[in-house]
Amino acid sequence: MKILIFCPYYPPHIGGLETHADEFNKYLSQNGIDITVFTPKLPVNAPESEIKYNNVKIIRFPAFEIIPNYPLPKFWSLKFWSLFSQLFKQKFDIVISRTRFFNTSLLALIYAKIKKVRWIHIEHGSDFAQLSSKTKTVIAKFYDYVFGFLIFHFSDQNISISRAVQKFVAKFDKRESPVIYRGLDFESIEKILPDLKIKKEFEKKIIISFVGRLYKWKGVENSIKAIKLLSKDLKEKIVFLIIGDGEDFPHLKKISEKENYIKMLGNLPREKAIGILKISDIYLHSSMPGGGLSTSLLEAMICNCAVIATPNEGADEVIKNNENGILIKRTDTNLAMEQIVHLIKNKQEIKRYSEKSKIDIHNNFNWKKSINLYAEIFKKR
């Protein structure tokens, strides 16, 4: 079987979707499936083409970001059209796209309909995009109603990566959209060493962390405000490490730069981010509605962090309140602050939650199980 995947981003670009897509391809290719990935050449120093895992071919087309974290092909580039047209000379059994609002999903639609190939769309979002300004948010919502509608309606099958995503897809398309959770590459995560340099730098402090793209809907501003509400003596006992970049970075840096217990570390390689998660005590998941299932949340749980989470971005599907973490009912600064205080004052709870969450992730997020579910869908006609 030959599969063509249109992917909005792909490693070495950093993000949860990227690791999801790459690990999906790695484990799917082990079933003897030939995979071609068509993706933006971002970052610009990424190779134009490469082969991974023996039978995963990656083709990167010229692209730019019209706004942060929204890539578009360089339509004026002959190189883009040459690479895209070459795909039409090949025969694929299935076309896959990821996330309806990225331009690559439109490319998948065009290709699948012209070539009359079965098209499976994998959706990662659970709400309309919330951007830094009302104008951008309104434009994004309009785009969703037009192009998102086309993607969901014209695909042959929509797959949701979480139950939250499934509910969102149902707003556009009443066909069944099965939920298939991602797996985690436990072996590669285990090989990454804890960041002992960071641990030594903040010796005797409780390390609180966040990893992810810095969009408004990630709710990191609420986490910063919650940390700021801590009493002076508690602030001296903690450090909050924020790893990631995005359109909210300048704003978040501005509101936190006077606080020496909050560190904005910017974009870091995934291995570095995992190393920091491994020496973190608490992970703050502050998302508003929007994402499907946070990869960073799952990685924090496998790295033995005690999690304080809002129910969004799939957290209420993996966190059982007071069993393997703390689930707060809504995005509320005071509620988050109260739970941070609770864990700082009850360190035995940090240990209990972190141990239970690691077991739960191992049991429920297995790539072999996920790939078997996808394989059953691929067999259908």
How would you label these PLM feature ranges?
Residues 52-53, 60-110, 114, 141-153, ...:
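An amphipathic, basic-hydrophobic alpha-helix
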Residues 4, 201-218, 224-228, 241:
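Conserved donor-binding/catalytic core segment of Leloir-type glycosyltransferases
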Residues 250-271:
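Nucleotide-activated donor-binding/catalytic signature segment of Leloir-type glycosyltransferases, i.e.
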Residues 267-268, 275-280:
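Short alpha-helical donor nucleotide-sugar binding micro-motif in glycosyltransferases
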Residues 41, 164, 183:
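Carbohydrate-associated surface elements
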Residues 321-322, 326-333, 342-347:
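Conserved acidic donor-binding segment of nucleotide-sugar-dependent glycosyltransferases
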Residues 118, 128-150, 167:
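Nucleotide-sugar donor phosphate/pyrophosphate-binding loop at the beta->alpha transition
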Residues 306-309:
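Short hydrophobic beta-strand element within catalytic cores of glycosyltransferases
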